[in-house]
Amino acid sequence: MSLVYMNIMIAFLTSLLGLLMYRSHLMSSLLCLEGMMLSLFILSTIMILNIHFTLASMIPIILLVFAACEAAIGLSLLVMVSNTYGVDYVQNLNLLQC
């Protein structure tokens, strides 16, 4: 495994660890999700370029489309929660609260 692959995997694992550790605020969770998507995009692009698999060249672009949709929905949810409750705690998203 080359050093580039290891660095990208470490970036993905760091973002995953951040998502698991700092899940009290919605903004921290969204930033960690964006880091995970960015590292997945870079990893898939490099792997497709290295193995010369031209049929799968659309996969990174599709991944970017899903990342953009995820970011838009996450930011709209963040604005809605911040306007409603005044803070961006994830515990405010529980729909089972009375």
UniProtKB/Swiss-Prot annotation:
Keywords: Electron transport, Membrane, Mitochondrion, Mitochondrion inner membrane, NAD, Respiratory chain, Translocase, Transmembrane, Transmembrane helix, Transport, Ubiquinone. The keyword Zinc-finger does not apply. The keyword Translocase applies. One of its GO terms (cellular component) is respiratory chain complex I. Pfam families: Oxidored_q2. It catalyses: a ubiquinone + NADH + 5 H(+)(in) = a ubiquinol + NAD(+) + 4 H(+)(out). The chain crosses the membrane at residues 1-21, 29-49, 61-81. It is an enzyme of class 7 (translocase). Its EC number is 7.1.1.2. Its main location: mitochondrion. It is a multi-pass membrane protein. GO terms for biological process: ATP synthesis coupled electron transport. GO terms for molecular function: NADH dehydrogenase (ubiquinone) activity. Disulfide bonds: none annotated. It is found in: Mitochondrion inner membrane. Core subunit of the mitochondrial membrane respiratory chain NADH dehydrogenase (Complex I) which catalyzes electron transfer from NADH through the respiratory chain, using ubiquinone as an electron acceptor. Part of the enzyme membrane arm which is embedded in the lipid bilayer and involved in proton translocation. Belongs to the complex I subunit 4L family. Core subunit of respiratory chain NADH dehydrogenase (Complex I) which is composed of 45 different subunits. This is NADH-ubiquinone oxidoreductase chain 4L. It comes from Mogera wogura (Japanese mole).
